[in-house]
Structure formats: structure tokens, C-alpha cells
Amino acid sequence: MASNKEIFQRYIDEFWNQDRLDVADELHTDDHVYHDPNLPELPRGPEGVKERGRIYKAALPGRVTAIHDWVVNGEKTLCFWTYEGVNSGPLGELPATGKNVAVPGMHLCHYRDGRIAESWVMWDRLGFFEQLNLATIG
């Protein structure tokens, strides 16, 4: 059986970096809960995970996520990552900007029976929109 760290690494490698959204069915529980303040209305389970993937894939096709550091504690993993890409598609109602972005974030997962049961994600949303020239401070 794969370790929790290996499961999450596979989620990054296959789901995010290879755009294999179908892998969510294998890696997430049927009642998976995704806590993302940017997308609070996602359905539970792998379908919600795939919907999140479709949204970001449309806005940042070809983006790459790299994990920089880990904390593994029993049934939980926490990782610090950065994703990079070009905003070449719409993000909700916002049009594509053609701008490059590099955005840091953290992802905390709780595992049950060898699958991701709950996820919390926080990323630098303000920095993301500043890089797209869609937000300013001051």
C-alpha cells in the first residue's frame, strides 16, 4: 500500500501536472471534502476535486506544480508548493491575460483507508491577481 506522502505526490504529478483528472476517483474518498475559500461551493467526492481541476486547467493550461517541503504526521500530510503557468484561458468571468504566474500555497490532507478524505488548501490569491494585473494594493 502506498504511503500518504506517495498518494499526495501522485495527486500532484498525475492530476495537476499531467491533467489526468480521472485519477481523483482512485485517490479520493467518495465523501471527500475540499476546503477551498476560493471555491466554497464544490460538491463532495471526486467530482468536486475534478471540477476544481477543470476550472484551473481552463485558466492555466500546462501549469506545473512543484512541492518544496513536507510535514507527514500519521494520517495527515502538509506540503508547501508553487504552481507556475500562463493565464491563457478565462478564470470564471475574468478573461485570459496572457501573463505568467508563480503562486505559492499549502495543502493539508487527511487520509482514510489509503485515500484522501479531506483537503484544505490555501494559496496566495492576492499575489496571483497582482501578477495578472487584476489587483493592486493601496
How does the language model describe each region?
Residues 1-138:
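C-terminal and inter-domain tail/linker signature
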